[in-house]
Amino acid sequence: GTLGNLPAPFPG
């Protein structure tokens, strides 16, 4: 995902 490539589907 985003926000530091976190393993979660964050919007962005």
From Swiss-Prot:
Superkingdom of the organism of origin: Eukaryota
Subcellular location field: Secreted
Tissue and organ distribution: Expressed by the skin glands.
Gene Ontology, cellular component aspect: extracellular region
A single BP term in Gene Ontology: innate immune response
Keywords assigned by UniProt, alphabetized: Amphibian defense peptide, Immunity, Innate immunity, Secreted
Role description: Probable defense peptide.
UniProt record similarity statement: Belongs to the frog skin active peptide (FSAP) family. Frenatin subfamily.
UniProt-recorded name of the protein: Frenatin-2.1D
Source organism of this protein record: Discoglossus sardus (Tyrrhenian painted frog)
Organism classification: Eukaryota, Metazoa, Chordata, Craniata, Vertebrata
